[in-house]
Amino acid sequence: MVLKKGVKFFQRLINSKSLRFGENYEDDDLVNSDEVMKKPCPVQIVLAHEDDHNFELDEEALEQILLQEHIRDLNIVVVSVAGAFRKGKSFLLDFMLRYMYNKDSQSWIGGNNEPLTGFTWRGGCERETTGIQVWNEVFVIDRPNGTKVAVLLMDTQGAFDSQSTIKDCATVFALSTMTSSVQVYNLSQNIQEDDLQHLQLFTEYGRLAMEEIYQKPFQTLMFLIRDWSYPYEHSYGLEGGKQFLEKRLQVKKNQHEELQNVRKHIHNCFSNLGCFLLPHPGLKVATNPSFDGRLKDIDEDFKRELRNLVPLLLAPENLVEKEISGSKVTCRDLVEYFKAYIKIYQGEELPHPKSMLQATAEANNLAAVAGARDTYCKSMEQVCGGDKPYIAPSDLERKHLDLKEVAIKQFRSVKKMGGDEFCRRYQDQLEAEIEETYANFIKHNDGKNIFYAARTPATLFAVMFAMYIISGLTGFIGLNSIAVLCNLVMGLALTFLCTWAYVKYSGEFREIGTMIDQIAETLWEQVLKPLGDNLMEENIRQSVTNSIKAGLTDQVSHHARLKTD
């Protein structure tokens, strides 16, 4: 435990080179944990363990930030930036910090020769941020409606680097989306189809972890397209981004079902969708290894659009307060939500996402189907298995319906990817398989009924007896051709009976035995049973008629006696 706390402290220290905003501290400066929390700096609250690819919440650091007396009961606004690694997320957040510290100034963006400090960032091709970091100074802002809110800025580990699995990327993105009120999805140059598919996977992983699923579980998603190179098609900024996003997320009838599902999923996950097109910052930024964020090295187009973007997210009138399940979230509440969510991702309840949501969802649902079907089969074996006696068909059907409902409830209780519509197909598959299994249990149970087992020989014997009687009668009155035909049928029935007995005794020629059973079943259902039912119905009708006649006769006799008297 002491070692873990030490590791956490040094990770916070390493990620906090700029302890005071605007000042740079040397790496070898010794700063205790209390000083770190007093000075503005990035603090890692979700630690990424590369050895086992697990994540750990630094509860102490999070509580020190969010449970300060002056902010803990304020509603919170969480602005997070997520996306692929080495795409300038931390760089953007540092300009957000400049705005938060100087929002009342027209020149909040800073001076031309002022280095960019705050969240640690650098040029190059290797990742910088791991896990999830937040700025340890929570900004208290007065809203136009007179209320105060707390604003927290969040930086996330870049996705798809060489050291992170798909599960790592999904966990970080899902956690940041679940806990933020505005998620900035940082992309380079364009919105490609794989960007949308990854977004679908990551948001589904977040939706799955939430206990109650509402129609739109997340709040605002802002697509930020960096290095936009087509201003002649869609202009820089919010309006051009809106037009571009509408085209990208449009659901068309001639689209493949997979493409339609991705777009429907994104629309169903977020209450608000936006897009901002940002130009390239310039060659000096991209190619100069010593670039430190000075505005003089950044192109004017980029600076102009940056002045529009940051207030769009952080101006008091534009702030989006965090809500979960329709209720506002305070700083104190957010601590508890972080604790609850991280436990879910540390456990084994959730399926591990793969490269495509569809594959994971199919495997997940098929496993749920198999488990529910197995539960049904084992329970039915206890009712009418091989060592159980014959059970009345009505009782068997009642047990079947009860156990089927149990199996469906089990299927529904399993956490599944894909959404209700996708899972419904697998529930239908489960119900169909259960009905097929039930049909086999019916046959198995009927085989234990001595009368059912004797149905084939009884039917054949009845045919032989009927043919014998008819043959005798027709021969007596001179209809020899009919008598010969009846004798032929009687001989055929006797042959079937002997063959059936041999098959049952020896176990050979089972196909022939099955065919004889089917013939006997058809004769029973189509001829003998209806004939017997008609005879019984006629007998019952005759009995009722006789009873009515007898009753009427008694009444007439009774009235006649009364008149005589």
UniProtKB/Swiss-Prot annotation:
Enzymatic reactions: GTP + H2O = GDP + phosphate + H(+)
Residue ranges, Lumenal side: 480-481
Enzyme class of the recorded protein, top EC level: hydrolase
Keywords, comma-separated and alphabetical: Coiled coil, Endoplasmic reticulum, GTP-binding, Hydrolase, Magnesium, Membrane, Metal-binding, Methylation, Nucleotide-binding, Transmembrane, Transmembrane helix
GO biological process: endoplasmic reticulum membrane fusion; endoplasmic reticulum tubular network membrane organization
Region (Autoinhibitory domain): 529-565
Designated name of the protein: Atlastin-2
